[in-house]
A protein has these predicted regions:
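N-terminal pre-triad scaffold of radical SAM enzymes
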Residues: 55-58, 101-131
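Iron-sulfur (Fe-S) cluster-binding segments and ferredoxin-like electron-carrier domains
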Residues: 130-142
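Conserved catalytic-core segments centered on acid/base and nucleophilic motifs
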Residues: 117-118, 163-165, 170-171
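Surface-exposed cleft-lining segments at the edges of enzyme active sites
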Residues: 137-139, 167-168, 196
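Conserved AdoMet/S-adenosylmethionine-binding subsite of the radical SAM
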Residues: 148-162, 171-284
Length: 284
């Protein structure tokens, strides 16, 4: 099924752009984002200040999916800094999932047969609802030294059957880094599945390179990729094409959504999201 999108000259240029170039060109100034979307800066002064609590970062392909002049656009609301972020709520916990005490660098081992490995601390887009915005990534740096410690831990725990690559966003790692890591995971005999949780292809579809697809195609591990898509407006032709490349090499595609007030907390919106996900081969 083909998903129609508006013809956009900037989008045409970016079809052939390198994902790292697009990432480097991401918008980090709230005022620039407001200018692009033709929204009045004076109405967002207090929200702009919340940038100091958590930086704004939005790749331009994702901005192109937003409706200009609409302050209630569901994609804009996910990334724009908010005045409400200054509210100090009684009982609020900066580590709600108790993730800051780890058995080894970069890992979370909550469940008997699977383990989460934080590949990289950064993301291509900073979502305002991020529950790891306070995670001490400086103590869990995404480098080969820490990955090797995680690999040693996995090798010493034969009950682990599945490794989940997370972050941050694991696809912030370059293809050669992922190749290094995945090949070493393959060498651990008790591992059978690899799960990759990522939002990067949603905001920069060019991240799904031929080299990355080949790495997954060559792996002995059963591979699943879980996208993070919250609204049907995030899905377009370029994302569809990227997902098709993954399906063609046998990757199982799933989606994880966050229920967000005034963004997707409506049955009709969620139904439309599920239908679009099915259309591009992703199981909601």
């Amino acid at each position: 099924m083909h998903i129609l999108t508006q013809n956009n000259p900037i989008r045409e240029e970016q079809k052939t752009a390198n994902w790292l170039e697009i990432l480097a060109d991401a918008v980090s100034d709230p005022k620039e984002l407001l200018h692009i979307l033709e929204l009045p800066i004076e109405k967002f002064e207090k929200s702009i200040a919340a940038r100091q609590l958590f930086p704004l970062r939005v790749p331009r392909p994702f901005i192109e999916k937003m409706e200009k002049g609409n302050p209630k656009d569901p994609l804009f609301l996910q990334v724009m800094s908010l005045e409400q972020e200054f509210i100090v709520a009684e009982g609020f916990d900066k580590d709600p999932l108790e993730e800051q005490n780890t058995a080894a660098p970069n890992i979370l081992h909550k469940y008997h047969n699977r383990l989460l490995l934080m590949v990289k601390g950064g993301c291509a887009v900073n979502c305002r609802y991020c529950f790891r915005r306070h995670f001490p990534y400086h103590k869990n740096k995404g480098n080969k030294a820490n990955w090797q410690q995680a690999l040693n831990y996995i090798a010493q725990n034969p009950q682990i059957e599945e490794v989940i690559l997370s972050g941050g966003d694991p696809l912030m790692a370059k293809d050669h880094e992922l190749d290094w890591l995945i090949k070493r995971l393959e060498n651990i005999p008790h591992l059978s599945r690899l799960r990759i949780h990522t939002r990067l292809p949603v905001v920069i579809p060019q991240r799904i390179t031929d080299e990355f697809c080949q790495i997954l195609a060559d792996s002995r591990l059963q591979t699943l990729l879980v996208t993070h898509i919250n609204h049907a407006n995030e899905i377009d032709d370029m994302l569809s094409a990227a997902m098709a490349k993954l399906r063609n090499v046998g990757v199982t595609l799933l989606n994880q959504s966050v229920l967000l007030k005034n963004i997707n907390d409506d049955a009709h919106i969620l139904k439309k999201l599920s239908e679009k996900l099915f259309r591009i081969g992703i199981l909601p």
